[in-house]
């Protein structure tokens, strides 16, 4: 075997360091110079043996942490039983997970796929068909929020209210218009302008908490307004719960914080506990799909659904909703103390449960990326949500002592900035 010339190998640059080793991976990620080789609970180890407290959890996916004993045992057994068959046949594991999701939510039926973007694509198709069948709209429009994020596939990207993700991928999919988050007047003005002459709007798509957009928490009055407005105008209310769902906020579903039920909502990330799965959950009134309207080769496979059901039951059995609520409050209080200690840099705590962000003041020269880099040196993994928000999404199993460690190491980052 002949080594490939270095000129053909991509390299990943990193602020303040030399490029990492050549790679044959397509250059789509600005990777950090950190090679993770092992995980256990809320902790990760790199190839040198250095230990890190993980406040990223695979970006809100590893709900039970890493190498969970129960999940590992169940999935090992499932691998020896059956991994995948086609949706041409009934899949018991899929039906079991669907039943659990329906029993625990406002939905009546479930479609399974492999990711959040896929789930949102399914929701977009659902809304378009609903608009055509129920409202007689030939070219339905979906209203989405500014600063939202719904995925990288083309329709989900087009529904995303952040142009920085869309640049270079035009023409975008048509049929999306944008309103200001938590602004009922913005929604009403946009809707009325679009529907001056004929019905054009099929649905409103929104995140209860904007994750990539900066951990912006929805306002209860605004979500009451959305539900009422959609009812009055016979349009669907769709929630993107890809990041907020499965207990991340201290409640199983983000919509529970508002006492507002969507007509359909999407899940992924935390549902699989680190394994690929997504879902669209639909109420009966929005169940417009027929056989052949949508499909997924791998969606709902036995392995992924066994992972999802195990995660779901462990969240219940270990009382992780209460743990998320308590540890989220502990983390919030600690972050507020950081703001008090570094008021020239920090502004506010955003989010809820274990989906929290620490906002940096706009006039500060500090960026979230700088804190991410400093945190790595302190043995802590955090991520950004834009340039001015430090995001923390630890596993739902995180302990009181581990939250204390997180805060101590984060404080060390800011202390170094002052020195």
Curated annotation (Swiss-Prot):
Compartments where found: Cytoplasm
Keywords annotated in UniProt:
Amino-acid biosynthesis, Aminotransferase, Arginine biosynthesis, Cytoplasm, Pyridoxal phosphate, Transferase
Q: Which GO biological-process labels does this protein carry?
A: L-arginine biosynthetic process
The reply to whether Nucleotide-binding figures as a keyword in the UniProt entry is no
Q: How cofactor binds (record note)?
A: Binds 1 pyridoxal phosphate per subunit.
Q: Which reaction does it catalyse?
A: N(2)-acetyl-L-ornithine + 2-oxoglutarate = N-acetyl-L-glutamate 5-semialdehyde + L-glutamate
Q: Name one GO molecular function term.
A: identical protein binding
Provide the binding site for N(2)-acetyl-L-ornithine: 152, 296
Taken from the record, one Pfam family name reads Aminotran_3
Needed cofactors, names only, are: pyridoxal 5'-phosphate
Q: Give the superkingdom in one word.
A: Bacteria
A cellular component term, taken from the record's GO annotations: cytoplasm
Annotated pyridoxal 5'-phosphate binding lies at 116-117, 149, 240-243, 297
Associated pathway: Amino-acid biosynthesis; L-arginine biosynthesis; N(2)-acetyl-L-ornithine from L-glutamate: step 4/4
EC number(s) stated in the UniProt entry for this protein: 2.6.1.11
Sites where N6-(pyridoxal phosphate)lysine occurs are at: 269
User: PROSITE patterns, from UniProt?
Assistant: AA_TRANSFER_CLASS_3 (PS00600)
Grouped into one coarse class, the protein's main location is cytoplasm
Known partners and oligomeric status: Homodimer.
Q: Which family does it belong to?
A: Belongs to the class-III pyridoxal-phosphate-dependent aminotransferase family. ArgD subfamily.
Additional notes on this entry: May also have succinyldiaminopimelate aminotransferase activity, thus carrying out the corresponding step in lysine biosynthesis.
What name is this protein filed under?
A: Acetylornithine aminotransferase
Which source organism does the UniProt entry give? Answer: Prochlorococcus marinus (strain SARG / CCMP1375 / SS120)
Which gene specifies this protein's sequence? argD
């Amino acid at each position: 075997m002949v080594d490939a010339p270095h000129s053909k190998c991509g390299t990943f640059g990193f602020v303040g360091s030399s490029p990492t080793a050549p790679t044959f991976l397509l250059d789509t990620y600005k990777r950090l110079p950190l090679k993770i080789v092992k995980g256990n609970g809320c902790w990760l180890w790199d190839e040198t043996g250095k230990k890190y407290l993980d406040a990223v959890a695979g970006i809100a996916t590893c709900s039970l942490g890493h190498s969970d004993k129960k999940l590992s045992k169940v999935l090992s057994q499932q691998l020896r039983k059956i991994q995948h068959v086609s949706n041409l046949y009934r899949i018991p594991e899929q039906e079991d997970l669907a039943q659990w999701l329906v029993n625990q939510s406002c939905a009546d039926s479930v479609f399974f796929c492999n990711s959040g973007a896929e789930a949102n694509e399914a929701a977009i198709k659902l809304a378009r068909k609903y608009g055509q069948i129920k409202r007689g709209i030939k070219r339905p429009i979906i209203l989405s929020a500014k600063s939202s994020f719904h995925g990288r596939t083309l329709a989900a990207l087009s529904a995303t209210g952040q142009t920085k993700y869309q640049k270079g991928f035009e023409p975008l999919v048509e049929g999306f218009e944008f309103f200001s988050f938590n602004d009922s007047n913005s929604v009403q003005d946009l809707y009325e302008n679009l529907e001056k002459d004929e019905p054009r709007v099929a649905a409103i798509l929104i995140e209860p908490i904007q994750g990539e957009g900066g951990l912006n928490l929805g306002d209860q009055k605004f979500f009451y307004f959305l539900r009422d407005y959609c009812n009055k105008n016979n349009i669907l209310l769709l929630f993107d719960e890809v990041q907020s769902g499965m207990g991340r906020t201290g409640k199983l579903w983000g919509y529970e914080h508002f006492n507002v039920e969507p007509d359909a909502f999407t899940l992924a990330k935390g549902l699989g506990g680190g394994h690929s799965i997504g879902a669209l959950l639909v109420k009966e009134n929005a169940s417009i799909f027929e056989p052949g309207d949508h499909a997924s080769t791998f969606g709902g496979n036995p392995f992924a659904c066994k992972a999802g059901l195990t995660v779901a039951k462990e969240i219940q059995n270990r009382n992780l909703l209460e743990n998320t609520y308590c540890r989220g409050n502990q983390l919030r209080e600690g972050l507020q103390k950081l703001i008090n200690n570094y008021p020239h840099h920090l502004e506010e705590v955003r989010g809820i449960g274990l989906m929290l962000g620490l906002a940096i003041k706009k006039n500060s020269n500090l960026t979230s990326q700088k804190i991410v880099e400093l945190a790595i040196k302190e043995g802590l993994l955090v991520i950004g949500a834009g340039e001015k928000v430090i995001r923390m999404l630890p596993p739902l199993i995180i302990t009181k002592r581990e939250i204390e460690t997180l805060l101590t190491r984060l404080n060390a980052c800011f202390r170094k900035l002052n020195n």
